[in-house]
């Protein structure tokens, strides 16, 4: 196994554990939840950067791909959209970080939570 593959495996494991840990909001404090969310965002960007060639080749010629490959692309896109939603609403609602936008409403909380569970479901597909 190459060093890049080992790094990707470790990164994937860290991303998965951190994502699941964020669901236990009641057991961790708000600051850890918010910092963990920002770390998750940074690690997702690293993951995308490290896989950019694979992602590009996977997406190219979408309509010529077999049905299973197209379904996987759609699942990945839904997961990506849920991550963007989680990050956007999380930053908007943050209250323990210097990035305090002060947006805290039931709609944002619900959107953040639903997007989190949609992302979790997409991870399982």
Q: What label would you give each PLM region?
A:
Residues 1-125:
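Membrane-embedded alpha-helical bundles that constitute the cytochrome b-like, heme-associated redox core
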